[in-house]
Design a protein with these regions (language model features):
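Short loop/turn motifs at secondary-structure junctions and domain boundaries
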Residues: 42-43, 114-120
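Amphipathic alpha-helical effector-binding/dimerization core
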Residues: 11-96
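Short loop/turn microsegments at loop-to-beta-strand junctions
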Residues: 7, 48, 122-124
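A short, hydrophobic, proline-anchored segment that marks a local hinge/packing element in signaling
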Residues: 123-131
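Conserved small/polar residues in nucleotide/adenosyl-binding loops
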Residues: 1-5
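Juxtadomain coupling helices with adjacent low-complexity linkers
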Residues: 97-102, 107-110, 118-119, 136-173
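Residue-level recognition of short loop/turn positions
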Residues: 7, 55, 107, 130-131
Length: 173
């Protein structure tokens, strides 16, 4: 896993890459999820992501970044604190945060702006399998000037329009 350099310092070796590749290959649905994210990205013009909780952080498992020059660019595998819309959905369903869960159940989504980065906003929804077990959160994110009173409900509608496809995929993993 680790390699010692000639100067005596250590760094991650190829074993880490192999382990990560094995982990990722266990998610055979990744291609299908990316296809859905790509469709969401095309409809909204914003970046789309699929996030899961990893301890006290959130990790972006799958991502399609917007093709716009002004986009919110994140690389798959990146971890962040549990804030913004994605973090709040994860907290609502993994920490049993009833206040957040009630908000999501009432509106269907969480919207935040400027929580992690000043100019970035996001809309996130929970993703469930056919047994209604929480699996992840799916979101759109981008520059907050593109998230208005008119566009936020449209982004939610787009996300929710793909929830049945996700539900079916997540039930087969």
């Amino acid at each position: 896993m680790c390699i010692r350099d000639s100067n005596g310092s250590y760094r991650l070796g190829p074993g880490s890459w192999k382990l990560g590749s094995i982990y990722n290959s266990n998610f055979k649905i990744g291609t299908e999820i990316r296809d859905i994210l790509n469709q969401i990205c095309e409809v909204t013009g914003q970046s789309a992501g699929y996030w899961v909780r990893a301890g006290k952080k959130k990790v972006c498992l799958y991502r399609v970044n917007s093709k716009s020059e002004l986009n919110h660019y994140v690389v798959e595998g990146t971890t962040f604190e549990l804030n913004s819309a994605t973090g709040k959905v994860l907290l609502a369903y993994t920490d049993k945060n009833l206040e957040l869960k009630k908000e999501i159940e009432k509106k269907g989504y969480i919207y935040t702006a400027g929580e992690r980065l000043d100019n970035i906003a996001s809309v996130a929804i929970p993703a469930f399998d056919n047994k209604n077990l929480f699996k992840a959160t799916v979101s759109v994110s981008g520059w907050k000037q593109f998230f208005t009173n008119k566009t936020v409900p449209k982004y939610y509608k787009t996300l929710s329009s793909f929830s049945n496809q996700l539900r079916s995929l997540l039930s087969n993993e």
